[in-house]
A protein has these predicted regions:
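An amphipathic alpha-helix signature
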Residues: 28-35, 57, 61
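Conserved beta-strand-loop-alpha-helix junction that forms the acyl-donor binding cleft
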Residues: 144-156, 173
Length: 189
């Protein structure tokens, strides 16, 4: 079993906006698409991966060739690529040095690629759906966490609308981040 409980096999997630699925990134096939998104000024301001495709490729290869604690994925909505996600073991990530991590905390990073996908509420819908799927498929995980840049108000609001709560602000090496947490809801008594 992988560190993320076979994320590629999690299947499609029905949402109000269509069928959502995560597919692990494939190189070199997905590189041009992802490098194009990383060079969009709105995305580049927060992801810092703008530049030639090899900048994006190095970032992806580090995860793909790693030990499985981070899985880079394309987000497909009704079969069309429209987002990029990183699902990772936050408790095993350097992030864990900056907050009181719990075993199996699972982190998410995301970006909505095409400009027409942004500003329509898609991020919140997909975040909520993925957080639920993570908590369902990873019973050992009690929390889904994220750390968007505090300046990225649209992202922070999307996490809030998806049921995450802002827990703290963290001074990370590359940004001041809002620690967002979506905890597993307790079972009714």
């Amino acid at each position: 079993m992988s560190m993320l409980d076979d994320l590629p096999g999690w299947g499609a997630i029905p949402t109000p906006v269509g069928e959502f699925r995560l597919r692990p990134v494939r190189l070199p096939a997905d590189l041009d698409l992802l490098a194009g998104w990383m060079n969009d000024p709105e995305i580049a301001a927060f992801w810092e991966l703008a530049g030639p495709p090899d900048v994006t490729e190095q970032h992806l290869r580090a995860q793909l060739d790693g030990d499985g604690r981070s899985v880079p994925c394309l987000g497909l909505l009704d079969g069309a690529p429209m987002s990029y996600w990183e699902v990772y073991r936050a408790d095993l990530d350097p992030l864990a040095r900056h907050y009181p991590a719990r075993p199996h905390d699972t982190g998410v990073h995301l970006l909505l690629g095409p400009a027409e996908s942004r500003g329509r509420g898609l991020g919140a819908v997909l975040l909520a759906a993925l957080a639920e799927r993570i908590l369902w498929r990873r019973p050992c995980c009690e929390r889904v966490v994220a750390e968007p840049d505090v300046r990225n108000r649209r992202s922070v609001r999307a996490f809030e609308r998806a049921g995450f709560r802002s827990d703290a602000e963290l001074d990370l090496p590359d940004k001041r981040a809002a620690l967002m947490i979506r905890a597993r809801l307790p079972l009714p008594a």
